[in-house]
Amino acid sequence: MKISLTNRVRTTIRERKLFREGDRLVLVALSGGADSVALLCVLRELGYETVAAHCNFHLRGVESDEDAAFVERLCRDLDVPLHRIDFDTVRYARERSISIEMAARELRYEWFGQLRKELAIEYVAVAHHADDNAETMVLNLCRGTGISGLCGMPYKRNDGIVRPLLDATRDEIEAYLLDQKITYRTDSSNEDTRFRRNLVRHRIMPLLKELNPSLQEALLRTRENLEGVAAFYSKATEDFHNTLRATSSISIREVKETPAPFTLLYDLLHPYGFNRDQIREVATSLDNPPGASFFSSSHRLLRERDRLTVLPLSPKMEVPELFGLKIGDSFLDLPDGKQLSWQRGTPADLDLEGLRLPNTKLLLPLAFVESLQEELGVRRPQRGDHIHPYGMKGCKTVSRFFIDRHVPRSRREEAWLLCQGTEVVWIMGYAADRRFAIDELSDTEEYLLFSFGL
């Protein structure tokens, strides 16, 4: 017995848990075409309260405006609230050097996200169906993809997008509309094979069906098999994802112990903007000495002694300086949320415990600070900085000091220096320069005791 479209959608919603129990309000992406019109009508049949959202991308001249007018009439006849928006899609694509298809996709989903917040609606239903998903699987296969790409479109996304028609075919949708005598718009651009999806739909899929007339069923079985594999894989990598989110780093040893380090690294790093070639290079560098850096458009990956650390790129911060500070002040807030504080007094007034170790404190004569106040400043380390570490002989670069102390690269770049001109007085929280250190204290002299917490 052939299942009706309404029952098929009901089953998909239930089995795929598209909506929370009792949640009946849905925003429907309504283009006016057969798929979206059928989706709107079926959801209403199933008792959902619907709100429609229509995008006019202005790609087909008068046709686009006629689509918008049709959607307005349909929503008025069905008493469905409608929200609509106009986009200059061609300009958007040109400014970002992306395809028209990608531009329309970005514009519509960004707007859907805004509408969800404005209307306090949890779900946005889009009308992708089984034929669309088969085309997506083929497209993804042709350009190269992983397990999730071979599965095609997800039934439900984390951003509230749901696809109730994903188990229904195009033929079933059109048969439903014909049976219900429901009219819809036909998009003439769907025949334009300059668009990749249309090329797959009109040329590649018919050829594949010559090889296997039951292509739709075969791809469905493949999808189901891959979904199972994807579920196992997701469970196996869950701890790595959780660790990376919580600490911004992962253990190199643990990555190397997995059966497929590159596959794992691709899964972990691709969401941060790293491409396949970069991730391949990261994977081959796991046994190399530390120090290498890799950059995506949004993040930096640091190859440290025993960990891979991923940090967001941020604009260069302006470092506040100590010149101009009033000795009567007691602290200086730094841009990253850390704080340098100080106390003024004689040795009897100050808490000097732990002054040398772990170097979270620095004692300087008040007279020295007052005389050099205009030359004192706080900044990040830079190439060529040197220090004569207290308790050690000789001089070394600040970078060598960090390496010898096994300080991770990410921590090095977050360090602060108290400097007198070009001289490093204190690697704040790590080591004072012995040239500025005080070996003998005067009971009557006043000092400034600087404190810094890592």
UniProtKB/Swiss-Prot annotation:
What is stated as this protein's family in its record?
A: Belongs to the tRNA(Ile)-lysidine synthase family.
Q: Which SMART domains match?
A: TilS_C (SM00977)
- Report the main location listed first in the record: cytoplasm
**Which of UniProt's keywords are assigned here?**
ATP-binding, Cytoplasm, Ligase, Nucleotide-binding, tRNA processing
Cellular location of this protein? Cytoplasm
Q: Which domain of life is it from?
A: Bacteria
Q: Which GO terms describe its biological process?
A: tRNA modification
Role: Ligates lysine onto the cytidine present at position 34 of the AUA codon-specific tRNA(Ile) that contains the anticodon CAU, in an ATP-dependent manner. Cytidine is converted to lysidine, thus changing the amino acid specificity of the tRNA from methionine to isoleucine.
The UniProt comment on domains reads:
The N-terminal region contains the highly conserved SGGXDS motif, predicted to be a P-loop motif involved in ATP binding.
Q: Which organism is it from?
A: Porphyromonas gingivalis (strain ATCC BAA-308 / W83)
Enzyme type, top EC level: ligase
Q: What PANTHER family does the annotation carry?
A: TRNA(ILE)-LYSIDINE SYNTHASE-RELATED
Name the positions where ATP binds.
31-36
Listed Pfam families: ATP_bind_3, TilS_C
Task: Give GO cellular component annotations, separated by semicolons.
Answer: cytoplasm
The protein's name: tRNA(Ile)-lysidine synthase
Asked whether the keyword tRNA-binding is assigned, the reply is no
| Enzyme Commission designation | 6.3.4.19
The record's catalysed reaction(s) read:
cytidine(34) in tRNA(Ile2) + L-lysine + ATP = lysidine(34) in tRNA(Ile2) + AMP + diphosphate + H(+)
